[in-house]
């Protein structure tokens, strides 16, 4: 497996985490829609349009909640796999670079600052860490 393949595999975690965030925002929008909708209060009989719309919004929110839970389970499984792969790398500095980038989602610049290295050195460490990682 090439370093590019390893990097793509590691990036799955961040992408899935971002997907969960998007799903949670979408669920919140459906909940907001459901709470904003209300039946007319003029005492006159009306069709069931508002009720159906509220029901649809609640149903969409519930479907999204179930999907979010499934994705969170996948995320936890993927995190365990990635952490196990990172642990195959000898050297705590290499592991730290991989963890900060692929689990924490830090930028290269932030990793360099936090680890007290130059940006270029962190990039070199990253390349060496990928080469050492066993998948």
Language-model region placement:
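Short coil/turn residues that cap or connect secondary-structure elements
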Residues: 86-93, 121
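DNA major-groove recognition helix of helix-turn-helix
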Residues: 126, 133
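N-terminal interaction/assembly modules
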Residues: 1-88, 135
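Short alpha-helical "recognition helix" segments of helix-turn-helix
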Residues: 110-113
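Helix-turn-helix DNA-binding helix
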Residues: 98, 122-123
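Short amphipathic alpha helix immediately N-terminal
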Residues: 90-104
